[in-house]
Amino acid sequence: MGMETLRNRLKELRARHDLTQEQLAQAVGVTRQTILSIERGNYSPSVLLALSIARVLEVPLEEAFWLEAENGRQEGE
């Protein structure tokens, strides 16, 4: 197994729900800076936080977060 990176589409999903970073942060109990860092890929959330975010955004975990291999392919392709 090669190097993998956790990717996300939080910004897109927040827009669908008309949520700001601050509103999502409050809903899951973190700071706006934490949401910003997750969106930018600078911080990988705990499983508990990722599940909480997915629940608030009303999507399966895999729709909000996924692993991407070093070669750019999504895990499982």
What are the language-model segments listed below?
Residues F65-E77:
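Short, charged recognition helix plus adjacent turn
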Residues M1-R16:
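A short, Lys/Arg-rich alpha-helix, primarily the initiator
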Residues D18-S37:
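Short alpha-helical DNA-recognition segment
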Residues R40, V59, A69:
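Short, conserved catalytic or interaction motifs in soluble domains
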Residues A15, Q26, R55:
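Alpha-helical residues within the helix-turn-helix
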Residues N8, D18-L19, P45-L48:
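Residue-level signal for the short linker/turn that defines the boundary of a DNA-recognition helix
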Residues L48-E63:
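DNA major-groove recognition helix of helix-turn-helix/homeodomain DNA-binding modules
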